[in-house]
A protein has these predicted regions:
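Membrane-proximal transmembrane or re-entrant/amphipathic helices at the cytosolic face
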Residues: 126, 145-188
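Specific pore-lining/lateral-gate transmembrane helices of multi-pass inner-membrane transport
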Residues: 1-78
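Membrane-embedded alpha-helical segments of multi-pass transporters/permeases
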Residues: 20-28, 86, 90-91, 113-121, ...
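Membrane-interface helix-loop junctions in multi-pass transport and translocation proteins
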Residues: 42, 72, 78-114, 146-161
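Hydrophobic membrane-spanning alpha-helices of multi-pass integral membrane proteins
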Residues: 16, 79-85, 133-145
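Hydrophobic, membrane-facing alpha-helical anchors
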Residues: 49-59, 105-118
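Transmembrane helix-loop junction
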Residues: 32-33, 67, 94, 121-122, ...
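Alpha-helical transmembrane segments
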Residues: 61-69, 117-130
Length: 188
């Protein structure tokens, strides 16, 4: 069971980081398709996308609590995240405005992930592939930073980072596609 959860986590992580990098890269150009009133909303998308990524990883770890019939641990870790979110919103909103909400959301989901990653080790020893996880996180955060701070030639750098994330995770995404297509082929 540990091997199964570790493999699924690795594949899931690969897919999520590739999607996240792609969404971050495309968020600003896609805003041109909307009315001018919505263009400025692009600045909220990058951090909310990473927050959503960590929420997805949290839900994966939540499945371990459910399998092991330890749902109260899920409640405790989510409560810690909720308290952190409230405190961080109180701290960030006066200083950085609406971007404080997105930053607080990201940091809160990251906290929940870290708590669950440590906490679930006592229930099921998953290999989180920490080097892969940290590398993906650094690459996507660099992409977000370049875009939000509008560094010179940010579009080129963000494109290169997205290609890098996708190349780094290619085997994982390909493995997931093979499994999905293999199952679909057997059903037909």
């Amino acid at each position: 069971r540990e091997r199964f959860f570790s493999r699924v986590f690795s594949l899931y992580q690969s897919l999520l980081f590739c999607c996240c990098a792609g969404i971050v890269l495309l968020c600003r150009p896609l805003m041109f398709l909307f009315k001018a009133n919505f263009y400025e909303a692009w600045q909220f998308v990058p951090l909310l996308t990473i927050a959503t990524l960590f929420n997805c990883l949290n839900q994966f770890l939540n499945s371990i609590y459910m399998v092991e019939k330890r749902s109260t641990l899920s409640l405790y870790t989510m409560m810690a995240g909720a308290v952190a979110n409230c405190a961080l919103n109180w701290l960030f909103i006066p200083r950085i405005g609406p971007n404080g909400v997105t930053l607080a959301s990201f940091l809160s989901y990251l906290l929940v992930f870290l708590l669950r990653a440590v906490n679930t080790r006592g229930l099921l020893r998953i290999d989180f592939a920490p080097v892969k996880l940290v590398f993906n996180g650094i690459m996507v955060m660099a992409e977000v930073g370049l875009m939000l701070f509008q560094a010179p030639h940010w579009a080129i750098w963000c494109s290169l980072l997205t290609v890098g994330v996708c190349a780094f995770n290619f085997q994982g995404v390909l493995g997931m596609l093979r499994q999905l297509l293999g199952r679909r082929g057997r059903r037909a």
